[in-house]
């Protein structure tokens, strides 16, 4: 199959699933596995592209917030820095493990189900208050973001869940989750770029551009949709989807093996 077509499809999947609480890694691992795709799946050009694309989505949707954070809300900037540290440490320390052993389909099945139950419980017990982020919130949600490095967990899913457990309003927890993910995604893009330089990887710029555009456009749509959705509805729709996806992956794995 044409590599450009794969880039478009996987870029769209990345843009949508990076920001919805359904795990982008699960979808990017499972989609090529289902269709038997190779090539672009292991391309550093594409890895960098989707990170850049989703970063563009975040900056487009929250550039006004970032201006306020840098020039007026310095405390929020400090909280974002503190919240980014756990994921940074975990990403460097466990990178090889995450990229190899933890990408097994059955591990993704387990994490999809377990985090779904966590999301459901958080919806029931969370107080959902509209209040300012505290240092404690930043530490807890930042630690949750580190856990999201495990495939199937979902960065937005686990961080919004952590915010709900801390008593934050659903939509506000999602917004802080997105702000917190910005430096993490930027860091991932820079790490991949560094790896590409280190190994002398030659970039396929057509795949890069297609990946950036498809991930950025769908990412913007996904962010705006989720923030609007969570102002009115609970996380149940995404919880049920996670469980459905887990069953599909398990059945496919069972019948293929």
From Swiss-Prot:
List residues traversing the bilayer. 4-24, 51-71, 78-98, 106-126, 133-153, 171-191, 207-227, 235-255
Family annotation (HAMAP family): Undec_diphosphatase
Miscellaneous comment text of the record = Bacitracin is thought to be involved in the inhibition of peptidoglycan synthesis by sequestering undecaprenyl diphosphate, thereby reducing the pool of lipid carrier available.
Protein name per UniProt? Undecaprenyl-diphosphatase
Catalytic reaction list:
di-trans,octa-cis-undecaprenyl diphosphate + H2O = di-trans,octa-cis-undecaprenyl phosphate + phosphate + H(+)
- Check the UniProt entry and state the signal peptide residues, or none: none
Q: Output the Gene Ontology cellular-component terms.
A: plasma membrane
Give one GO biological process term: response to antibiotic
UniProt entry tagged with the keyword Membrane: yes
As for family, the record states: Belongs to the UppP family.
What membrane topology does the annotation report for this chain? Multi-pass membrane protein
């Amino acid at each position: 199959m044409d590599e450009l077509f794969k880039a478009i499809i996987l870029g769209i999947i990345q843009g949508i699933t990076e920001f919805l609480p359904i795990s982008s890694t699960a979808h990017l691992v499972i989609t090529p596995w289902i269709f038997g795709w190779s090539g672009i799946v292991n391309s550093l050009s594409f890895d960098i592209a989707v990170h850049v694309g989703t970063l563009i989505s975040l900056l487009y949707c929250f550039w006004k917030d970032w201006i306020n954070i840098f020039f007026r809300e310095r405390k929020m900037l400090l909280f974002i820095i503190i919240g980014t540290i756990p994921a940074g440490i975990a990403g460097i320390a466990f990178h090889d493990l995450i990229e190899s052993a933890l990408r097994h389909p059955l591990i993704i099945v387990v994490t999809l189900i377990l985090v779904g139950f966590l999301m459901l419980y958080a919806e029931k017990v969370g107080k959902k208050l509209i209040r300012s982020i505290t240092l404690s919130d930043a530490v807890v949600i930042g630690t949750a973001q580190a856990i999201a490095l495990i495939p199937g967990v979902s960065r937005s899913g686990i961080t919004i869940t952590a915010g709900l457990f801390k008593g934050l309003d659903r939509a506000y927890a999602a917004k802080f989750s997105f702000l917190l993910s910005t430096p993490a995604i930027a860091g991932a893009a820079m790490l991949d770029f560094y790896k590409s330089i280190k190994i002398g990887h030659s970039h396929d710029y057509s795949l890069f551009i297609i990946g950036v555009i498809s991930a950025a456009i769908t990412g913007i749509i996904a962010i705006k949709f989720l923030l609007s959705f969570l102002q009115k509805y609970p996380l149940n729709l995404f919880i049920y989807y996670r469980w459905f996806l887990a069953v599909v992956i398990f059945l496919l794995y069972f019948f293929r093996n």
